[in-house]
Amino acid sequence: MNAPEILNGATAAAPAGTGEATPVHARARSPLTRREQKEAYENNKLFKRLARQVGEAIVDFNMIEDGDKVMVCLSGGKDSYAMLEILMRLRERAPINFDIVAVNLDQKQPGFPEHVLPEYLKQLDIPFHIENQDTYSIVKRLVPEGKTTCSLCSRLRRGILYRVAGELGATKIALGHHRDDILQTLLLNMFYGGKLKGMPPKLQSDDGKNIVIRPLAYVKETDLEKYAELREFPIIPCNLCGSQPNLKRAEMKALVRDWEKRFPGRIENMFNALANVVPSHLMDHKLFPFAGLRATGEADPQGDIAFDEEPCSTDSGNSTTLDGAKSIAIVQFDDL
């Protein structure tokens, strides 16, 4: 039995003497082995976690509203496949009504298997549109050899998708960026752009005509990798992006993966920090009126605590408190 069958609960084979497969609901299910039971349990937990996180993001940022027509951008990668499937499953039990239309932009890259996505989407029995635009040739012509193509390719793709959304009557454009993409963008902007800027879960397009949403904003990439493997999605690699050497985003991805492995909890804290911003403790005078600050003589609970002692976990494992709990070291800022 393969992984998709375990995830869906379909376990029986076709009856003897027939050459045709029997519909899942009509088959007599054979007992699961202990290993298959464990796999099914873990796979079900994974889907529930993904569905919960997507649902939370949709609610937290009011991504999808009653009557929306959501244009799900499908690239052929693991993230967009998972996003489409989860949104379809959530729609079945959502308290609101919304439509889904899947859209793929065929950029005419050499070797792109044009048949894969149409065949897959027909099996799902949902509306879809394949937009054929040769942006590949434009990018290769305009970008010098050895330079990264991502910026120009992204701008061309964005403009086309905005136009298609208008033609299809879509009210929301769903992109498959996940938690790790958001953190990588934050680090890229900090390290190479000098900006404290990430990737928003919801935004208005630069032309003011579209709302872009990222339903996978709370989802870890490793979970999406596991889910794609279980579902056996027909993954289509991007020969234009993935084959480019020395991409800064690849460096950030490796950095995030390394931190997550070596320092459990660090990445979660970084991600949580994006939703816990304190403008008065940054340095952007456009966000906080530093110039107008005056001593009022009244206590301010939101005031400066830069000279207070800050708890920093040592994680050394060498010292414990009387009750056996790990101690917290108090570190003064002037000692750092």
Swiss-Prot record:
Highest taxon in the source lineage: Bacteria
Region (Disordered) residue ranges read 11-31
**Disulphide connectivity of cysteines:** none
Taking the first listed entry, what is the main subcellular location of this protein, grouped into a coarse class?
cytoplasm
**InterPro entries reported in the protein's UniProt record:** Rossmann-like_a/b/a_fold, TilS/TtcA_N, tRNA_Cyd_32_2_STrfase
Q: Which GO terms describe its cellular component?
A: cytoplasm
Subcellular location per the Swiss-Prot or TrEMBL entry: Cytoplasm
Identify the EC number(s): 2.8.1.-
User: Pathway, per UniProt?
Assistant: tRNA modification
SUPFAM superfamilies hit by this protein: Adenine nucleotide alpha hydrolases-like
* Positions that bind [4Fe-4S] cluster: 150, 153, 241
What is the purpose of this protein? Catalyzes the ATP-dependent 2-thiolation of cytidine in position 32 of tRNA, to form 2-thiocytidine (s(2)C32). The sulfur atoms are provided by the cysteine/cysteine desulfurase (IscS) system.
Other known facts: The thiolation reaction likely consists of two steps: a first activation step by ATP to form an adenylated intermediate of the target base of tRNA, and a second nucleophilic substitution step of the sulfur (S) atom supplied by the hydrosulfide attached to the Fe-S cluster.
How is the subunit organization of this protein annotated in UniProt? Homodimer.
Q: Which family does it belong to?
A: Belongs to the TtcA family.
Task: Give the protein name, as stated in the record.
Answer: tRNA-cytidine(32) 2-sulfurtransferase
Q: From which source organism is this entry?
A: Paraburkholderia xenovorans (strain LB400)
Gene (UniProt) = ttcA
